């Protein structure tokens, strides 16, 4: 069958045009920086400034629609921030490192922090405004001395802690997750100034804690899958892997060898001692039990006239069971009788839905999370476990609660205070008095 040369030429043009479009969305003259798996580290991770990265697929319709907008953003931010793009089809390893599931995905890389997902509107103004906020935050951190330029280029740590175990994707589960030992793990980035400052302290702590507590470190530039797995958001992050290895919690103490050693030693000692649920009887008790605890769990128990001693003791036995389950975690458990600490109840919104109730508090951060299910053993265990992973949603306390001094419970049933009866006539002065007043 005869085919017109023009028709064949048209078909070839369409085919080759299609393959050309599928190879890339941004040409050599585009203001958007072209990324590959080989230059990603130098262009993005080692950058001293904010970098916006679009992960795209050439066949993706939404990616094609975003192309002119992304180039407009690149022109707007020229000289202020880097706007880049990477073909996730051609460079799948880079996409896998950041858990890319759909296209286009936009991530913003800020020095010293984990990448941030951009989930706003896909117009140039919205994207540029979001970038501006990140740039402003970076400048603010540098002015306050929290972040410093890296000088361009990622450098490996000159001296790895000799007693700290180097952890990676191939050995992390075997050494940490499957272990019965306590592990304290530092997640760092080689270019991070705060990480470099911590390095000698970490080395000293690891050496002094040998045989007592395991210390390890993860290079997040290399082991990004581990970083994502434990939701590491900044560097350095120190996580404590206690008995429940699936729910590590952050170390929030000072970044000195002595502080880390003291924390680890106290953790080991507390795991061996008896558990306790302390009655909150004043500000000194609050400071002692909640001041240094990662999470402070406070239970608000019914008035003794409502539960009697037998009922209250049952609640306390239940709380002791919960405390025993989490004895190796840096938690504290306290209880307080209903309406004895009114300012605390007000700030954590307890009382309106009855007693008993429980809240998880982080005093340092000034936040809390309420127990929303029944005050029963299984629900309490689940609540404490979830609170340890940040899965309960924190609510601000809006200020430090005022704790008042109260008497410690004597372990007995309460006594109903009977009030003296009075006569309405006596209150009003009696009939004679009323009559006399009327006569006047």
Swiss-Prot record:
Q: Where is the Thioredoxin domain?
A: 25-136, 154-269
Q: Which domain of life is it from?
A: Eukaryota
Q: Name one GO biological process term.
A: response to endoplasmic reticulum stress
Catalytic site residues?
Answer: 60, 63, 192, 195
Q: Which GO terms describe its cellular component?
A: endoplasmic reticulum; endoplasmic reticulum lumen; Golgi apparatus; plant-type vacuole
Q: Which keywords, in A-to-Z order, does the entry hold?
A: Disulfide bond, Endoplasmic reticulum, Glycoprotein, Isomerase, Redox-active center, Repeat, Signal
Q: What class of enzyme is it?
A: isomerase
The signal peptide here is 1-24
Cellular location of this protein? Endoplasmic reticulum lumen
Q: What is its main location?
A: endoplasmic reticulum
**What factors induce this protein?**
By chemically-induced ER stress response.
Give the function comment from the record. Answer: Acts as a protein-folding catalyst that interacts with nascent polypeptides to catalyze the formation, isomerization, and reduction or oxidation of disulfide bonds.
Q: What is this protein called?
A: Protein disulfide-isomerase 2-3
Q: Which organism is it from?
A: Arabidopsis thaliana
Q: Which gene encodes it?
A: PDIL2-3
